[in-house]
């Protein structure tokens, strides 16, 4: 005999609230951020920092992700971070930008000074 457990969406939301990272700043698309990720190498742990521009954000409750882009040595590098991951140790907003799009995928085809975004002062 199989035991079937059905969870209502209300119950799922309550369970997810326990795992949501509460010290996360309100990050938006176009923000330049510095992210510290916990890296395990053998039996040692260290925090690796990376910096870049948020080109997209997918709001999905516990599974919220941000895509961060940076050009390193002439090569564009994008990485998707799970915002509520326990591996994320620090998330700092360095500057905010004034944008009119929800996804900044057009930055992939831009080079040099064309990738700059207008800064927003609050």
From Swiss-Prot:
Main localisation: plastid
Record lineage: Eukaryota, Cryptophyceae, Pyrenomonadales, Pyrenomonadaceae, Rhodomonas
PANTHER family noted in UniProt: LARGE RIBOSOMAL SUBUNIT PROTEIN BL19M, RIBOSOMAL PROTEIN L19
InterPro entries, per the entry: Ribosomal_bL19, Ribosomal_bL19_CS, Ribosomal_bL19_sf, Translation_prot_SH3-like_sf
GO molecular function, one term: structural constituent of ribosome
Family note: Belongs to the bacterial ribosomal protein bL19 family.
Compartment(s): Plastid, Chloroplast
Keywords assigned: Chloroplast, Plastid, Ribonucleoprotein, Ribosomal protein
A GO biological-process term: translation
Entries under Gene3D superfamilies matching the protein: 2.30.30.790
Originating gene: rpl19
Pfam families found in the cross-reference section: Ribosomal_L19 (PF01245)
UniProt protein name: Large ribosomal subunit protein bL19c
GO cellular component entries: chloroplast; mitochondrial large ribosomal subunit
